[in-house]
């Protein structure tokens, strides 16, 4: 977010580091959470990327985006959409005692290098209501089946719960997803947790950020990116996570 109350950690002091992480790791495609329109525009100064996504408050530009940014030279967008985590998912709304509207952005893409097709979903589950997180997990499973069908897919985001909690258990027990952290062919690099509370000396314990993959996808590596700690500059209050994968 771009929150004045963040003091020294306001977005104006973080945006350069955020863009440096993106360019240094050269992401082909990635999901973002807690992104306001002005922050999205700052990230789009990286001209190699295009985006899909809308604001959760009005389906246009208001409120948090969960955008998907993709490198246009590597990935072709075919079509896209979004849904809300609520009982009325086709319009801006909230249910299940959710603190606020929650949205999922999705797109169908083609990898220009391999000519393979895949879907990508970017979500942010509610941070207050466990009822909302459980029902959001159920809706995500339902929507992925409806939208992606038999094609490979990636689902990213801050799901605000640990791996042993009910929402993640439901998703993984559906048989439609694998947790990339658990199936990486190489040992995951960096801390398991991602939420560091603006503290370089804090060892994050809670793994609440995920890259969930369709079961046929091969995950070659998983990394929690700690460039912030190494350079002494924060880009976010979460460490980013990254995988290398083969379809």
Q: What kind of feature is each model-predicted range?
A:
Residues 8-22:
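Short catalytic helix/loop segments, enriched in acidic residues and glycine
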